[in-house]
C-alpha cells in the first residue's frame, strides 16, 4: 500500500471546497478556521501513518513543530495519539486553547528541537516552513527526532501559490516587501506575516529537491487539492502557481 492510498480517498472536491470556505475566517474567527484545519490535518496524518506502517495511529507520539495556540492538540488527542506541541513564541501559546486541551507543550525553536534522536513516532510541521529563514534546517531536525520507520510530515505554503502572501493577498505577486508595505499603508501596522522577517519565499521545487536529497521521501502531494488534481505537483513551473500547499512525507 502506498503512503497516500487511504488519504487519497478522503481528498475529494467537496473536502477542498469545504476547507477553502473556511479560509476567510482565519483572521476573524481563528477558532473556527484552525479547528477545521486541525481536524483535517489529524485525519490526514492518521491516514498516512496507517497506510505507510500498516498499523493504527492510536498511542503513537506526534510532535507538532510550530503548534502555536494548541488548536491541533484536541484533534490528535481524539484519535488516541499522544500530542506534544513545540512553539517558540509565548504569545502564540497563549493566543488559543493550549492550556485547556490535551497534550503537552514545549517552548523551543523548530530548527533546534530539544528532543533526542529517534524519540517520536510522527513529527509534523503544518504551515511553519515558510515562516523560518532556513526551512530545510527545520526539515532535518524533524527527521532527526523521528524514529526509524516513523513519519515526518512537512506541509508548507508555496510562495508563488495563491495564498503565498498570507494576509497581504495576491499583492505578493508584486513582490513580498512591496506587498507588506502596501498592507502597512492600508491597515496602519505591519502584517503579522511580514516578508523578510516572519515570512519567506519557499518554492515547491526547493522542497522536493531537499526531500529527495534525504533519501527518506515516500510521498509528495498538494495538500488541499482533490486527488484528481495531484498531477499538478509533478509539473515544474506549473506547480509553483497552482499548488497552494505542498506536503512532503518522509520515513527515516
Swiss-Prot record:
The reply on keyword Nucleotide-binding is no
GO terms for molecular function, please? S-adenosylmethionine-dependent methyltransferase activity
Matching Gene3D superfamilies: Vaccinia Virus protein VP39
UniProt-listed Enzyme Commission number(s): 2.1.1.-
Gene Ontology process terms (BP): methylation
* Pfam families referenced in this protein's UniProt entry, alphabetically: Methyltransf_11 (PF08241)
List keywords of the entry alphabetically: Methyltransferase, Transferase
- Would you identify the family this protein belongs to, as annotated? Belongs to the methyltransferase superfamily.
Q: What is this protein called?
A: Uncharacterized methyltransferase Mkms_0228
Amino acid at each position: 500500500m502506498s503512503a497516500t492510498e487511504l488519504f487519497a480517498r478522503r481528498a475529494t472536491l467537496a473536502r477542498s471546497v469545504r476547507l477553502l470556505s473556511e479560509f476567510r475566517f482565519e483572521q476573524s474567527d481563528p477558532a473556527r478556521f484552525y479547528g477545521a484545519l486541525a481536524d483535517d490535518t489529524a485525519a490526514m496524518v492518521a491516514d498516512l501513518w496507517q497506510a505507510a506502517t500498516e498499523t493504527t495511529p492510536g498511542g503513537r507520539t506526534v510532535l507538532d513543530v510550530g503548534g502555536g495556540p494548541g488548536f491541533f492538540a484536541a484533534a490528535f488527542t481524539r484519535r488516541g495519539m499522544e500530542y506534544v506541541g513545540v512553539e517558540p513564541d509565548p504569545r502564540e501559546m497563549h493566543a488559543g486553547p493550549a492550556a485547556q486541551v490535551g497534550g503537552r507543550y514545549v517552548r523551543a525553536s523548530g530548527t533546534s528541537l530539544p528532543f533526542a534522536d529517534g524519540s517520536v513516532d510522527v513529527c509534523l510541521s503544518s504551515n511553519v516552513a515558510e515562516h523560518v529563514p532556513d526551512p530545510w534546517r527545520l526539515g532535518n531536525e524533524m527527521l532527526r527526532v523521528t524514529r526509524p520507520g516513523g513519519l515526518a510530515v512537512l506541509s508548507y505554503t508555496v510562495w508563488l501559490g495563491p495564498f503565498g502572501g498570507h494576509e497581504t493577498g495576491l499583492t505578493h505577486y508584486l513582490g513580498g516587501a512591496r506587498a507588506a508595505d502596501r498592507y502597512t499603508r492600508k491597515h496602519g501596522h505591519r502584517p503579522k506575516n511580514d516578508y523578510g522577517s516572519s515570512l519567506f519565499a519557499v518554492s515547491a521545487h526547493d522542497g522536493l529537491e531537499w526531500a529527495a536529497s534525504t533519501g527518506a521521501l515516500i510521498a509528495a502531494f498538494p495538500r488541499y487539492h482533490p486527488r484528481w488534481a495531484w498531477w499538478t505537483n509533478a509539473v515544474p513551473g506549473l506547480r509553483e502557481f497552482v499548488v497552494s500547499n505542498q506536503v512532503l512525507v518522509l520515513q527515516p
